[in-house]
Amino acid sequence: MKLTFLGANHEVTGSCTLLEAAGQRYLIDCGMEQGKNVYENQPLPVAPGEIDGVLVTHAHIDHTGQLPLLVRNGFRGRIYATKPTTQLCSIMLRDSAHIQEFEAEWKNRKAKRAGAEPVEPMYTVQDAEAAMQLFRGM
């Protein structure tokens, strides 16, 4: 068994650990870093399509906030969480997506005036809804 700490290495947010055992790869959480520009969140060093599943410890965004991005980038495995965590994630991930879209829109209005390149939201409500389809409540 091998554990690789991918997030929350230098601070407490962005929890994400890769568990490799018996030829399978699972993430333990897939959280968003908070407290800085969310556009600085780094991609995973593992292709999302190579991950077999995600185990979610709880619904906080610093433990679940990059799940929609993971799905957007090709993850098709299952996301395992308790039923209450799944219910909370349904609300929180959609809300986070709304915030991502709003912030991108706001930054793009400023960028247009400054002649800068537009930015994309980290993920959209549609991405959050796609992620929710992969949840399996336990």
Model-predicted segments: where are they?
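Conserved beta-strand hairpin/beta-sheet module of binuclear metal-dependent hydrolase folds
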Residues: M1-G49, G53
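Hydrophobic/aromatic beta-strand patches that form the interior of the parallel beta-sheet core
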Residues: T4, Y26, L55, Y80, ...
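Short N-terminal micro-motifs specific to bacterial/archaeal maturation
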Residues: H10, I79-Y80, V119
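Phosphate/oxyanion-binding loops and surfaces in catalytic or ligand/nucleic-acid-binding neighborhoods
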Residues: L19, M92-I99
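Short, low-complexity, polar/charged sequence segments that are solvent-exposed and flexible
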Residues: A22-R25, P45-P48, G74-F75, H98-F102, ...
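Active-site metal-binding motif and surrounding structural segment of the metallo-beta-lactamase
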Residues: N37-L88, R94
